[in-house]
Amino acid sequence: MANPIDQPLTAPKVANPGPLGLAGFGLTTVVLSCVNAGLLPAEAVPVVVPLAFAYGGVAQLIAGVLEFKAGNTFGMVAFTSYGLFWWWFAFLKWTVGAGWLSTPPASAMAVTLLMWGVFTFLLWIVSFRSNKAVWSIFLLLWITFFFLAWGDFGYMIGPWRCGTIGGYFGLLTGLDALFVAFVEVLNATADREVISLGRPIIRA
């Protein structure tokens, strides 16, 4: 009989935090994008604020910390950054709505969203080494940020406000993230690849 001390220790199986972060990001993005696209009235924003604090913010921060522990630099940077984005958004809407801060000029919001678009574009370039599903999320997201920024600058494309177009791109982004989260949970639960998320565009 083998000595138990001599038996190799097996590392406990650790869950993938990615689906949690994607779900928090995707669900919150869909709800806010319904407002940006005009599918919900502006009065619906107070519904988004606690959702952004809790699921959009905290869930992604948890995912970011777990990605850090797993040694995934890309996942850590992405989830932590967008989790803090939702905290920034929620805190801004909360303080302005409570009258603690004055409403910022549209140009300030535009520049902020534009910088988030630039940041997301850079992460999109990095995501060429990830699977095609994650790559598509970042593609749609930087387009969303740019359209929202142009909307705050007051630009239009024909009869369409750029902010409204950004809302529809945001809907696609959020739904894409939710789908990827679902697929990752499904594959993990089945312990096999039920649905493929696509191979990386750049594999070298």
Residue spans for each PLM region:
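N-terminal topogenic module of multi-pass integral membrane proteins
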Residues: 1-63, 67, 202
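Interfacial loop-to-helix junctions that mark the boundaries of transmembrane helices
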Residues: 12-17, 41-48, 101-108, 159-165
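Mid-membrane cores of alpha-helical transmembrane segments in multi-pass membrane proteins
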Residues: 21-31, 50-62, 75-92, 107-120, ...
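Membrane-helix interface "capping/anchor" motifs
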Residues: 66-74, 125-136
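Transmembrane alpha-helix boundary signature
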Residues: 92-100
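Alpha-helical membrane segments in multi-pass integral membrane proteins
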Residues: 109-122, 132-155, 159-183
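Short, highly charged, low-complexity non-transmembrane loops/tails of multi-pass membrane proteins
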Residues: 190-204
